[in-house]
From Swiss-Prot:
<comment type="similarity">
    <text>Belongs to the GPI family.</text>
</comment>
<comment type="function">
    <text>Catalyzes the reversible isomerization of glucose-6-phosphate to fructose-6-phosphate.</text>
</comment>
<comment type="pathway">
    <text>Carbohydrate degradation; glycolysis; D-glyceraldehyde 3-phosphate and glycerone phosphate from D-glucose: step 2/4.</text>
</comment>
<keyword id="KW-0324">Glycolysis</keyword>
<keyword id="KW-0312">Gluconeogenesis</keyword>
<feature type="active site" description="Proton donor">
    <location>
        <position position="341"/>
    </location>
</feature>
<comment type="pathway">
    <text>Carbohydrate biosynthesis; gluconeogenesis.</text>
</comment>
<dbReference type="GO" id="GO:0006096">
    <property type="term" value="P:glycolytic process"/>
</dbReference>
<keyword id="KW-0963">Cytoplasm</keyword>
<dbReference type="Pfam" id="PF00342">
    <property type="entry name" value="PGI"/>
</dbReference>
<dbReference type="GO" id="GO:0048029">
    <property type="term" value="F:monosaccharide binding"/>
</dbReference>
<feature type="active site">
    <location>
        <position position="501"/>
    </location>
</feature>
<dbReference type="InterPro" id="IPR001672">
    <property type="entry name" value="G6P_Isomerase"/>
</dbReference>
<dbReference type="GO" id="GO:0005829">
    <property type="term" value="C:cytosol"/>
</dbReference>
<dbReference type="InterPro" id="IPR035482">
    <property type="entry name" value="SIS_PGI_2"/>
</dbReference>
<feature type="active site">
    <location>
        <position position="372"/>
    </location>
</feature>
<protein>
    <recommendedName>
        <fullName>Glucose-6-phosphate isomerase</fullName>
        <ecNumber>5.3.1.9</ecNumber>
    </recommendedName>
</protein>
């Protein structure tokens, strides 16, 4: 396996100075470096990959056991080895079973919970479940991490399909987040969803208590307007939420992969069970493709291999996700968690130090906004930032097709500009046309040179529908899985989030003066003193 990595790096070193544009002299470049699956068109021809590099990457995937590991995941094997758990978020969108964990078919339970969620969502939507002030007008979803990022992203993405109550998402323990969500809504017609797998997450439970106190000022029985998305029926009950309004999920569903089940209840209420089922169907379609397609034609595998070429082989430590679809403005933040929490590891599955770079820093903003913010660095900065563009061929505003045409033109132009660049000769010609000469021409031309040869991929889809969004999210989930397998890490734990939480719990009594902070470092204690000096804690 080390030999393949060495071959890849040697291949890159030998080819690194060539121009991507020259690769298109081979007539079938676009066909060879693109793939189409169920309405998704993935173009990775604007990269420095060639047949030899792609062949080596595919061999690496085979040698590292992507196919066998994929089969193990779908079979319910406990591939989350550090926690001893199966990884079966895919079961939440599966149409039927059997799917077994520890010899037990989990699908009857999955389908029963899905039906319960759909029934409750429809009751809220049609008014048969009411608040104490009448029909539900607003839903406040309280969660953090996977209990917020996925639902909030998808709810915004599918705004054209909203025909239910208004949705509000609260995640941050910062009181400003809760205060902003509750402004202007009526507690007598508000439903609160508390999303916490353990029902102990400190930020979520703090916000839940605040929401209940807020509601208690105007409502006789606040608990009657609360719903729990949790595996802990007991803790939800202690909070006042009965079992019939508690929707649970099993430990084989990781938080950042949980949107497909009860954690998606808010989205179900917003768009309705039928549209949510289409969302599940899109993801299930991608699951089947990932399971069945040969590696060379497998969209999640190709997405992963391109990413690994850029990160592990070319050494680019960051990846920009650039959706030219304003309703996908939360997708980069969602993918930050999905990719960085999954593959931001330094230890291999066997406990040894990782031999390759782990996952990249993922970030981004929607186009065209980003063009007027950070694209300057992407085009002319000293660091190469591989870019992933996403764009729909068709928008949701038929009266504004000229807007969408301009949006698409900008997206395609950016990918072309990153690859093509502008030479010094071209820049000189531009300055000469403006009447500049001599040293001033040279000086001004230098500022207008674009190095080009900067890689990007484009994911084109017909229109952002529930089905398409399901496909896209599942595509990225499986991409993360493939990258994790090749790196030899566990993509399904997140021990890196624990230490900070433990230290925060210990610091709170220091802030209130109940603990003197013995053993804390001088910097932390000085910051505590500075906060206490201002007051307000």
């Amino acid at each position: 396996m080390g030999e393949i990595w060495s071959e890849l790096k040697a291949h890159h070193s030998a080819k690194s100075r060539r121009k991507m544009l020259d690769l298109f002299e081979k007539g079938n470049r676009v066909q060879a470096f693109s793939a189409t699956v169920d309405g998704l068109y993935f173009d990775f021809s604007k990269t420095n990959l060639d047949d030899g590099a792609l062949s080596l990457l595919l061999e690496l995937a085979r040698v590292k056991g992507v196919e066998s590991r994929r089969a193990a995941m779908f079979a319910g094997d406990k591939i989350n080895e550090t926690e001893g758990r199966a990884v079966l978020h895919t079961a939440l969108r599966a149409p039927a079973g059997p799917i077994k964990v520890d010899g037990q078919d989990i699908m009857p339970g999955v389908l029963e919970t899905r039906a319960r969620c759909f029934t409750f969502a429809q009751q809220v939507r049609d008014g048969s479940f009411t608040a104490q002030g009448g029909r539900i007008t607003d839903v406040v979803n309280i969660g953090i991490g996977g209990s917020d990022l996925g639902p909030a992203m998808a709810t915004l993405a599918l705004a054209p399909y909203h025909d239910g109550p208004r949705l509000h998402y609260v995640s941050n323990v910062d009181g400003a987040d809760m205060n902003g969500a509750l402004q202007g809504i009526d507690p007598k017609t508000t439903l609160v969803i508390v999303a916490s797998k353990t029902f102990t997450t400190i930020e979520t439970m703090t916000n839940a208590q605040t929401a209940r106190d807020w509601m208690a000022q105007d409502v006789a029985d606040p608990s009657a307007q609360f719903v729990a998305l949790s595996s802990s029926t007991e803790k939800a009950g202690a909070f006042g939420i009965p079992p019939e309004r508690t929707f649970g999920f099993e430990d084989w569903v990781g938080g950042r992969y949980s949107l497909w089940g009860p954690i998606g209840l808010g989205l179900m209420i917003a768009i309705g069970p039928e549209a949510f089922q289409q969302f599940l169907d899109g993801a299930a379609t991608m699951d089947r493709h990932f399971q069945e397609a040969d590696l060379a034609d497998n969209l999640p595998v190709l997405l992963a291999l391109v990413g690994m070429w850029h990160n592990q082989v070319e050494g680019h430590a960051t990846r920009a996700v650039l959706p030219y679809d304003n309703r996908l403005s939360r997708l980069p933040a969602y993918l930050q968690q999905l990719e960085m929490e999954s593959n931001g590891k330094s230890v291999a599955m066997d406990g040894s130090a990782l031999q390759q770079n782990s996952g990249p820093v993922v970030w981004g903003e929607p186009g065209t906004n980003g063009q007027h913010a950070f694209y300057q660095l992407i085009h002319q900065g000293t660091r190469v930032v591989p870019c992933e563009f996403l764009v729909a061929a068709k928008g949701h505003e038929p009266d504004l097709t000229h807007h969408h045409r301009l949006l698409v033109a900008n997206c395609l132009a950016q990918s072309e500009a990153l690859m093509r660049g502008r030479s010094m000769e071209e820049a000189r010609a531009l300055m000469a046309a403006k009447g500049l000469e001599g040293a001033e021409l040279e000086r001004q031309a230098a500022h207008r040179v674009f190095p080009g040869n900067r890689p990007s991929t484009t994911l084109l889809y017909d229109q952002l529908t529930p089905f398409t969004l399901g496909q896209i999210i599942a595509l990225y989930e499986h991409r993360v899985f493939v990258e994790g397998v090749i790196l030899g890490i566990n993509s399904f734990d997140q021990w890196g989030v624990e230490l900070g939480k433990e230290l925060a719990t210990a610091l709170e009594p220091v802030l209130t003066g109940k603990d003197d902070g013995a053993g804390k470092d001088g910097s932390t204690l000085a910051l505590v003193d500075a906060v206490k000096a201002v007051g307000g804690i």
